[in-house]
């Protein structure tokens, strides 16, 4: 069922004030029910991503891909790449030392700037799933993330 509502234009500001007041204590923070929590300072690796991604044959028919949280992951500037802008499909790629990566589709230059640091690192918590790329490389597909800190070095 669908319906519509209209209000006189002169009442618009009053409605906005009313809604703002009514929902001022409402927490809009996303909440995820995850299957596993990894320590972003030590648990991330191609092997860990592969172990979960390679179980893809059991997902489906009521069994969803496991949703994984990564806590306290540091992104250094040299790890972060943004590509696909010219094709209209901006994608962030965070390369790990072992060749695997964390990937976020539907990104932007603004998001890249938020996560990039030339003089230190940005710390995030993220949620997502493990997959393999088209080339068979294990990767972590970021569903959502939050920036929890940053460290800039000044000399």
Question: Which residues does each predicted region cover?
Answer:
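Acidic, two-metal ion nucleic-acid-processing modules in DNA metabolism proteins
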Residues: 1-155
